[in-house]
């Protein structure tokens, strides 16, 4: 096989090359790489590559026994872009570029723009035609274009494609098999989106995909590019959005990859004090170079447009923004203004977001940015970076630290629960409980919780309830929804056998119920980024580790959220109520169905006329130990109707509390006793005596919880040291495939 002998008309003004060198070719993949083409009636493949320092380049592969120089490329522009048409080559043929460096060395490189690649440990590129896939997600795409990106529900299930579930022999599912397994689960659980750890081609399994060598190729570990298209298409058909991790911050030093592509720095910053992350062993892109900007922005748009991905979570943004990131004194140089900001990276991120969201305002651009860099989610025109979402790493760190604290000492750390509200509305935040928090000795989420076996589950249920109600979109890493005890290991599937144990199935049921509640109640997502959607009621009850607040939607509907972060039953807890009327408990983490003690309010709770917390009325409730409760706040019309009925003779009744196990049981009144007034708030002393009877308002005596006959409704014991989960007296069921 010989290359076509034709004179390639070199012209520096050729539009794709011109735009590429200007940093404005945002579809560079259409020109560079390997493309099936017919010339002079002969089908074949045209190859194009950018290599500004190369002396010579040839295409090598099985078709020429990998012989260097047998199929030499020619410069298109007389400068840095090389091209060759080879007749007879076809789809799936393997190839590389053999580059002769200025030092006289031969280096074999995979195609930076390849659409497909060999499966590791092999690393050659493959000719592949991405055109012709029949998409069926028109309805999804149309709905997304009309959706309110910022003020809509977003509840993300973060997952690693290869280790969510595996087949016999510890083999991962391919894209098609995974879709068949994943879609019913995500649909059942009620997540709105899945977020995939990087699926761009990468050589090292242990990098989880964060050391990318193929920025235009879905990893071949699980199938072909069109298999991945089908995976996305099927999720969209099921109403599930797809977000993927995208890694523009750095790339690995593998010899076949981008590193020293033509023997010298091309994609990486040539300055050694800017071009390498020594701690990670990776190279940093030269964000100020136009050709690199074209490469990266083309990659971002490629996934959004060619694979219909709904959004990108941009990895390691903080490492891009700061020249001194993970560098000691003397290992970095200040910018031209004497500062530590990477001005070129800042300009690149603004350009990236302007380009992507300018074309696709309904897509998500999510920054993993772990510092206090200002205005990450504000428009570039206003001095921001232009993302539309940012991970709230501060909230995550504070809350996990708080939840790991023994409840005996949480009173002194109460600020970790409330501090996030000093900045909660400064950015469009996502609350991330991600893969990074359940690896490297950090322990799984449930193993971060203090106490013995059952206490861990109660803590986690309380945390999940608080997280779902806190302003911001949601993200949870796979396995945490059912209480995976082991840390995540990319080489093993999740411990699905745990669903043979009651506590794990109950926790999964709780997560499912929370997800459904979130999706069905706009108060939890419609006004996430303004004080108009949130109001404190009890922010400062640190001694009892209790908080209470309101979430509101634009129609005026409100949800009252009360969290008890202490394993103490609190009877007669009184707090302010925004509207007079009856408050219906709509979710309780202590419900027996979720593995709790069953101390729930089956009947609505009436307000009484005692002003508290800035409101004209209040309610008195029972707080189960270690629990989160949601109450539906009456609308003013509902409250007025209830008040009118209450004025009628014989209609005034006191709210009573039962458990779901005994809905018909009535509270027995003791004759001759006059009810005492409710205290302003339970005291520390009261908290230590859960056996005391609650005092109640004359207008609405507090309900006394009725214990279920099969469970003891008692206060949690003091937390003990962590220990492995105990078997609950029966064999686990087999994991459902």
Annotate each language-model stretch with its function:
Residues 308-310, 325-490, 498, 519-590, ...:
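Conserved alpha/beta catalytic core and glycan-binding cleft of carbohydrate-active enzymes
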Residues 118, 138-153, 160-341, 605:
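Substrate-binding/active-site clefts of carbohydrate-active enzymes
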Residues 1-153, 176-186, 454-457, 466-476, ...:
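Carbohydrate-interacting/catalytic domains
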Residues 74, 205-209, 253-260, 377-378, ...:
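Short glycine-biased active-site loop of nucleotidyltransferases that positions the nucleotide triphosphate
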Residues 636-737:
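Intrinsically disordered, polybasic Lys/Arg-rich low-complexity tracts
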């Amino acid at each position: 096989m010989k290359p076509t002998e034709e004179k390639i008309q070199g012209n520096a003004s050729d539009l794709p090359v011109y735009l590429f060198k200007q940093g404005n070719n945002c579809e560079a993949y259409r020109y560079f790489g390997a493309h099936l083409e017919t010339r002079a009636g002969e089908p074949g493949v045209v190859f194009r590559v950018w290599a500004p320092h190369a002396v010579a380049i040839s295409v090598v592969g099985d078709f020429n026994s990998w012989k260097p120089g047998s199929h030499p490329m020619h410069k298109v522009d007389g400068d840095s872009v090389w091209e060759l048409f080879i007749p007879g080559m076809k789809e799936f043929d393997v190839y590389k570029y053999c580059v002769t460096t200025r030092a006289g060395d031969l280096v074999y490189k995979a195609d930076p723009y390849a659409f497909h690649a060999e499966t590791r440990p092999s690393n050659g590129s493959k000719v592949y035609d991405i055109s012709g896939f029949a998409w069926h997600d028109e309805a999804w795409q149309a709905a997304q274009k009309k959706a309110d990106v910022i003020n809509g529900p977003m509840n993300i299930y973060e997952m690693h494609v290869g280790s969510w579930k595996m087949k016999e022999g510890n083999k991962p599912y391919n894209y098609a098999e995974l879709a068949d397994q994943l879609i019913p689960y995500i649909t059942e659980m009620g997540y709105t989106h899945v977020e995939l750890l990087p699926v761009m081609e990468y050589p090292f399994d242990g990098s989880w995909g964060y050391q990318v060598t193929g920025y235009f190729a879905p990893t071949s570990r699980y199938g072909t590019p069109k298999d991945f298209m089908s995976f996305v298409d099927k999720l969209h058909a099921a109403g599930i959005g797809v977000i993927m991790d995208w890694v523009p911050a750095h790339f690995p030093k593998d010899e076949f990859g981008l590193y020293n592509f033509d023997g010298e720095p091309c994609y990486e910053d040539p300055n050694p004090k800017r071009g390498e992350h020594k701690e990670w062993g990776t190279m940093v892109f030269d964000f100020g170079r136009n050709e690199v900007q074209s490469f990266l922005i083309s990659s971002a748009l490629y996934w959004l447009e060619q694979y219909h991905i709904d959004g990108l979570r941009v990895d390691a943004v903080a490492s891009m923004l700061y020249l001194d990131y993970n560098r000691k004194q003397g290992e970095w140089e200040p910018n031209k203004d004497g500062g530590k900001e990477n001005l070129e990276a800042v300009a690149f991120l603004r350009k990236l977001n302007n380009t992507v969201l300018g074309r696709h305002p309904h897509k998500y651009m999510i920054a993993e940015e772990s510092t206090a860099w200002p205005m990450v989610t504000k428009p570039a025109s206003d001095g921001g970076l232009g993302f539309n979402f940012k991970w709230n790493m501060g909230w995550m760190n504070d809350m996990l630290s708080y939840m790991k604290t023994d409840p005996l000492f949480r009173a002194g750390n109460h600020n970790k629960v409330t501090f996030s509200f000093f900045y909660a509305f400064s950015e469009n935040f996502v609350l991330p409980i991600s893969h990074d928090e359940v690896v490297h000795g950090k322990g799984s989420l449930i193993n971060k919780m203090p106490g013995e076996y059952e206490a861990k589950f109660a803590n986690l249920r309380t945390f999940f309830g608080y997280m779902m109600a806190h302003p911001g979109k949601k993200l949870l890493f796979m396995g945490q929804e059912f209480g995976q005890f082991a840390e995540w290991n990319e080489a093993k599937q999740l411990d699905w056998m745990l669903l043979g144990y009651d506590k794990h199935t109950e926790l999964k049921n709780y997560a499912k119920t929370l997800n459904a509640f979130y999706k069905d109640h706009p108060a939890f997502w419609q006004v996430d980024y303004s004080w108009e959607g949130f109001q404190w009621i009890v922010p400062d009850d640190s001694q009892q580790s209790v908080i209470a607040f309101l979430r509101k939607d634009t129609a005026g509907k409100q949800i009252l959220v009360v969290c008890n972060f202490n394993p103490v039953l609190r009877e007669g807890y009184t707090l302010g109520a925004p509207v007079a009327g009856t408050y219906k408990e709509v979710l309780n983490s202590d419900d027996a169905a979720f593995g709790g003690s069953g101390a729930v309010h089956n009947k609505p709770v009436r307000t009484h006329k005692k002003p508290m917390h800035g409101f004209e009325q209040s309610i008195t409730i029972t707080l189960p130990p270690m629990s989160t409760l949601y109450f539906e706040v009456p609308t003013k019309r509902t409250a007025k109707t209830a008040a009118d009925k209450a004025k009628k003779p014989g209609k005034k009744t006191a709210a009573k509390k039962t458990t779901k196990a005994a809905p018909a049981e009535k509270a027995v009144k003791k004759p001759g006793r006059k009810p005492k007034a409710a205290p302003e708030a339970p005291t520390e002393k009261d908290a230590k005596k859960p056996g005391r009877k609650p005092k109640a308002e004359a207008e609405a005596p507090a309900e006394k919880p009725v214990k279920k006959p099969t469970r003891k409704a008692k206060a949690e014991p003091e937390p003990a040291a962590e220990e492995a989960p105990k078997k609950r007296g029966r064999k686990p069921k087999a994991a459902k495939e």
